[in-house]
Regions:
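Positively charged n-region of N-terminal signal peptides that target proteins for export
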Residues: 1-4
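Bacterial N-terminal signal peptides
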Residues: 6-16
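A short, N-terminal "cap"/entry segment at the start of jelly-roll beta-barrel domains
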Residues: 18-80
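A short local loop/turn or secondary-structure capping micro-motif enriched for an aromatic residue
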Residues: 74, 102-104, 160
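His/acidic/aromatic-lined binding-pocket segments of jelly-roll/cupin-type domains
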Residues: 76, 83-86, 123-124, 132
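Short beta-strand segments in beta-sandwich/barrel cores
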Residues: 91-94
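Short acidic-glycine-tyrosine-enriched beta hairpin
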Residues: 99-136
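Ligand-binding loop in jelly-roll beta-barrel domains
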Residues: 125-130, 136-160
């Protein structure tokens, strides 16, 4: 085998190895989540929406958010993003499908809309430890029971 091919293969292998070792796993401990959640609860108490969100990770085509809701907020539709929700604590009802009411652009991201609610959607009760996947383009609405709060992780993945 010619020397230039051997050197090229060695360079490709080394570059691949460097790329693999440059990316390290990201760990969020239970204690870290509790701290972040406590801070977001305090923030949510200070705003009329009773909603606070913190970005934990952002890798471009996927990201992780920690969300706290003290009461029901807007319905959402994400044209380009699928959501996977893990309920960290609390009970909520997820309404999906149907028709968004008073749908409007959220003004901050292309393809993202908000609404005052959903009519004719299906309701799924979710509890601590539950996980649900919401494909891109599906309207969804998190309803929180009165006088309770909920915290959940949202794993967002860009629809390709």
């Amino acid at each position: 085998m010619p020397r230039s091919i051997i050197l090229s293969l060695a360079l490709i292998s080394a570059t691949s190895l460097i790329a693999q070792t440059a990316q390290t796993p990201t760990l969020h401990t239970g204690a870290d989540l509790q701290q972040r959640e406590a801070a977001l609860i305090e923030t949510a108490k200070t705003v009329p929406t009773g909603f606070a969100v913190g970005t934990m990770d952002n890798y471009g085509n996927d990201r992780t958010l920690l969300v706290v809701r003290l009461h029901t907020g807007d319905a959402e539709r994400h044209q380009f993003w699928a959501d996977q929700i893990y309920v960290n604590h609390g009970d909520l009802i997820l309404v999906y499908g149907g028709t968004m009411q008073q749908e409007r652009s959220n003004g901050t991201a292309p393809g993202e809309t908000l609404g005052s609610g959903i009519e004719g959607g299906k309701e799924i009760p979710l509890h601590t430890g539950d996980i649900i996947h919401i494909p891109a383009g599906i309207p969804h609405w998190v309803k929180v029971a009165t006088a309770t709060s909920t915290a959940y992780l949202v794993f967002k993945e860009k629809d390709k």
